[in-house]
Amino acid sequence: MDHLSFLESKAPAKKAVSVLPISMGIGSDVSGTADAPAYLLKLGFKEALAVAGFRAEVLPEVLVSNGVKGKEARLAAISKTVVAVREIVKGEISKGRKVLALGGDHALSIGTIAGAAEATADIGIIWIDAHADANTWKTSDSGNVHGMGASAVLGFGDERLTSVVKKKVKTKNFLYIGLKDLDQAEIDLIRSEKIAAVTMMDLLEHGFPMLAKEIQALQKKAKKVWVSMDM
């Protein structure tokens, strides 16, 4: 099968993928994020996967208590949700299936990566985001958990989040792509832990060859790679 086969509408859909809708919106102050999974599926996301050569099974939606108010209450609700997400992702990967999680704000990545890490030896993470999401409960001005996902899976931050990740991701197996808006505390963490990062400025100055080099370096260290992308 050549790469052109993915562009053929009649290509056989043989690659199984589990699509996990997660209607999480309490990790950020951005309205509408909780509605994204249902919206994408309504517009034909599953059908688009079939055209690309995947046999998609849409799993039951992970429902979130998006109406809770207050930082502490939201943190508790998020912690409970990402534990559920962790178990689903771990179970699907353990069955040999690929998982595509649809959010929702990026706080859900704590659960998806936690599950993938438990089911995979030496996992690598590619984090595609304009923001580092490397704040902690102590360094965050807003208290929004969507800005703490990366730090949590690496083992930094509030125990209510880090405890969800039973198998922490190694900092050497983590790659940022697309950074352009960071807090100083996040910059300090990335520097102190020597986490690989390709910023938007790097891409503008050096182009995609630099990006390809960093991805290849990650592939040499990690057996499997999980991609977490915030749009």
Please give the residue ranges for each predicted region.
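Conserved alpha-helical scaffold segments that buttress catalytic/binding sites
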Residues: 2-231
